Amino acid sequence: MICLGEVSFQALADARQIGVDEYWLLGDILMPGTGRRRILDLLDQLPITARVLGNWEDSLWHGVRKELDSTRPSQRYLLRQCQYVLEEISLEEIEVLHNQPLQIHRQFGDLTVGISHHLPDKNWGRELIHIGKQEEFDRLVTHPPCDIAVYGHIHQQLLRYGTGGQLIVNPGSIGQPFFLDAQLRKDLRAQYMILEFDDKGLVDMDFRRVDYDVAAELQLAKDLRLPYFEVYYESLVNGIHHTHHQEFLRELAQKEGCDRELDDWLKSGND
C-alpha cells in the first residue's frame, strides 16, 4: 500500500539510495490518502516490472461508477474517497489501475516467485493474516507451484513458510502499517522490503522501515481537504484504522459534512 504523499517519496528515496533497480507494486495504490496525481506521476518514473490488483483498486473502480452501497457508513466512506480521487485522476487512468492481474510470476534462475495482493484468486479477506491457517498460506505456493510467494494486503511485515518449505513473505505497508500489539504500534514508519537475487538464488531479504514527516503529511491532508480527516489522523498517529467502524464513520461524516458532499455527487448522475 503506497497511498500516502510524503511517506511515498521518503520510501522511494531510501530505495534509490540503496540502489534498487526494479519495483513491484502489490496493489492499493491511491486510497486512502493525499497522493492522487503525485502518486501516479511518481510511479511513472519507476522501473516497475510487476504489479497486481489490490482490493482498493476494485473499490475505486466500482465506487466511481457509484456501484457501492450508499446506505452503509463504510461504503459511504469509500465512495467519498473515490469522489476525492476523481478530482485529479481520470476514469481512463482508473481503468488502467483496475486492469491488472490478481497474481503473476517472475523467474530468477531456478527460483519461481509468485506475486499477489492476497490469495491467488481473491484480493480481499482475512485468510492470510498473521494467524491464518497453514492451508491458506499454502495456496500462495501451490496454485500454481512457486518457491517464493510475495503478497501484500495485511499491512504487516511477515516471514513464514509453506508446508513444503517454500518461502512466504510480506513487505508490510508504505502507507499504513498495522499492529495488534500496542508497543509495536508505536513504530509506524513506512515499511517495504528489498529482495536481492543473483545467479545462485536469493541472496538477501531486507525488511525496511523509513521515517517520514507525519506532521507534514497531516498538514497536506488538511490543505487538500482529504475527506474523513480524523480517520487518516488516527491511522498515521495512533495506528488505529476505523475504515470498518460503522458508527464512528457515521458520526464523522456528519461532523465533517461528508454526507452532504457525497449525496450531491451521487445525485449528479455519472459525472
PLM segments and residue spans:
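A short acidic, helix-capping loop that chelates divalent metal ions and anchors anionic groups
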Residues: L60-H62, N123-W124, A216
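Active-site neighborhood of divalent metal-dependent phosphoester bond hydrolases
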Residues: L42, L46-I104, L128-L140
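Short, glycine/charged-enriched secondary-structure capping and boundary segments
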Residues: Q10-A13, R38-D41, R65-L68, I129-H130, ...
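Active-site neighborhood of phospho(di)ester-bond hydrolases with catalytic His/Asp-centered motifs
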Residues: Y23-D28, P32, A50-N55, S116, ...
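Acidic, His/Gly-rich catalytic cores of divalent-metal-dependent hydrolytic chemistry
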Residues: T163-D271
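N-terminal active-site segment of His-dependent metallophosphoesterases
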Residues: M1-L46
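Active-site environment of divalent metal-dependent phosphoester hydrolases
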Residues: I2-E6, M31-T34, W56-W61, V150-G162, ...
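His/acidic metal-ligating clusters that form di-metal
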Residues: I18, E87-R160, Q166
